[in-house]
Amino acid sequence: MNSPALPHVTIFTDGACSGNPGPGGWGAILRFGDIEKELKGGEPHTTNNRMELLAAISALEALKRPALVDLTTDSQYVRQGITAWIHGWKRNGWRTADRKPVKNVDLWQRLDAALQPHQVRWHWIKGHDGHSENERADQLAREGVAMAKLMRTV
């Protein structure tokens, strides 16, 4: 018996930080056929790498059923971490090759869990290079930074 084909979803993500650490934001664009959804958020005290990770996590967690996902990021940290480094980290009990604890382990574990229902192909593009969806994700991330700055003043 053949299983039905997975729906195809395209995701573009970005993270931003005002200071590193400092207030940060993330943005994601999800596209399924003609349907598009924008997501964004922020945290008052964070790092750029955490926001890059949270953009991918939030986008994947927003999917309601298993999908074939093409996820594009401008973060080598995220792409390399999830396609190359994570396997060794898991084997080493979430420690790096030199036995130090993995930074942002909470988010790496959350990303690992968010991937499980899906088939994800990871793509990297150069940031701020005129790629329209990356520019839009960056704008959403900057809006997330603005939201995070407001959170700090409350």
From Swiss-Prot:
Its cofactor is Mg(2+). Binds 1 Mg(2+) ion per subunit. May bind a second metal ion at a regulatory site, or after substrate binding. CDD domains: RNase_HI_prokaryote_like. It catalyses: Endonucleolytic cleavage to 5'-phosphomonoester. Pfam families: RNase_H. GO terms for cellular component: cytoplasm. Its EC number is 3.1.26.4. Residues 5-146 form the RNase H type-1 domain. It is found in: Cytoplasm. Mg(2+) 1 binds at D14, E52, D74. Endonuclease that specifically degrades the RNA of RNA-DNA hybrids. This is Ribonuclease H. It comes from Nitrobacter winogradskyi (strain ATCC 25391 / DSM 10237 / CIP 104748 / NCIMB 11846 / Nb-255).
